[in-house]
Amino acid sequence: MREWFTRAAVAVALMPTPAFADELKIDDLVVANTIPAPQRDATVNAAKGFYQFWNIGDEALLKAAISPDFTDHTLPSGRPQGPDGPAFASKTFRAAVPDLSVEVRKMIVAGDYVTVHMVFRGRFTGTFGKARGEGQAIDFIATDLLKVTNGRITDNWHIEDNLTLLTQMGVAKVEQ
């Protein structure tokens, strides 16, 4: 069974995708073999576009990847709901970490759902609230669960390692 998933993952990785999605590096892509090819391709491309948006900040990628009915089920305080939320989050975070990049370590596609484990990296050279960056290295993990319908992301549940992020920024201190 695992061998079949591996072959399917290789096939998906080799299929043609939009140019923006080709730029995104995914370390490990696993796709369930029960997904019809058109749905599989649309789902993988939506997810790739979404994470390429996070990788480079181009809002055209975001608009192509998410539905107008997008819902963030783990909406942080102060972030707008809907399609404007990820754009707001990206702008806010890029003000603190202008060279922000994302590496997708694992993407698992099963039916309408995509689970993604990623690493965000960059240097804190901007501002975050009252904190001013001094070039600190930023390197923290996050995991998303996306629902994709008709090739567009409709729902997102996400969790980020904010303690590591805030500690790296010097905003939080962990006493041992």
Regions found by a protein language model. Give the residues of each.
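Exposed beta-sheet edge and beta->alpha loop/turn motif
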Residues: V119-N150
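A solvent-exposed, acidic/Ser-Thr-rich amphipathic alpha-helical stretch
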Residues: A42-N45, E59-G111
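Short, low-complexity N-terminal intrinsically disordered segments enriched in polar/charged residues
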Residues: A21-A64, P68, V174-Q176
